[in-house]
């Protein structure tokens, strides 16, 4: 079963960044995705991490990476969407994806396009996320 959770503890955030090959930045936020047992009381394995920054007009998904040996792009997309939803509910209008932080295929599945400077207007996105083309 998939679990996606924010990482509040900075030490754990740093450890999971290291595990997934993401740069640790103390001022960034992060979510992790994990495979958990049926009642969600035990982590079977870490799937990946998503680090992001929310500061004024500088709202960026910095990293979206899988743990070594894990190939679950669907879980990465779900985790990134959870981060985007959190940002939207926090009042963020636009979010940019750092293209160095994930692969192009995953970025496109999330709706980020180079032609749009890898930026999504979250208000427009959440009007119809399955039809978002802007």
PLM feature spans:
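Short loop/turn microsegments at loop-to-beta-strand junctions
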Residues: 27-31
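Conserved donor-binding loop and adjoining core beta-sheet/short helix segment
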Residues: 35-74
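Non-catalytic positions within long, well-ordered alpha-helices that form the structural scaffold/packing
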Residues: 85-88, 108
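Conserved GNAT acetyl-CoA-binding A-motif
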Residues: 87-100
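Conserved active-site alpha-helix within GNAT-family acetyltransferase domains
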Residues: 100-117
């Amino acid at each position: 079963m998939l679990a996606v959770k924010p990482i509040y503890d900075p030490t754990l955030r740093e450890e999971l960044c290291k595990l997934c090959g993401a740069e640790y930045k103390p001022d960034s936020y992060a979510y992790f995705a994990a495979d958990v047992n049926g009642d969600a009381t035990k982590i079977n394995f870490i799937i990946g991490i998503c680090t992001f920054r929310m500061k004024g007009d500088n709202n960026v998904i910095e990293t979206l990476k899988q743990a070594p040996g894990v190939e679950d792009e669907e879980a990465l997309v779900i985790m990134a969407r959870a981060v985007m939803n959190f940002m939207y509910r926090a009042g963020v209008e636009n979010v940019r994806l750092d293209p160095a932080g994930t692969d192009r295929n995953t970025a496109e599945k999330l709706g980020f396009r180079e032609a749009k400077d890898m930026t999504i207007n979250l208000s427009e996105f959440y009007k119809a996320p399955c039809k978002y083309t802007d």
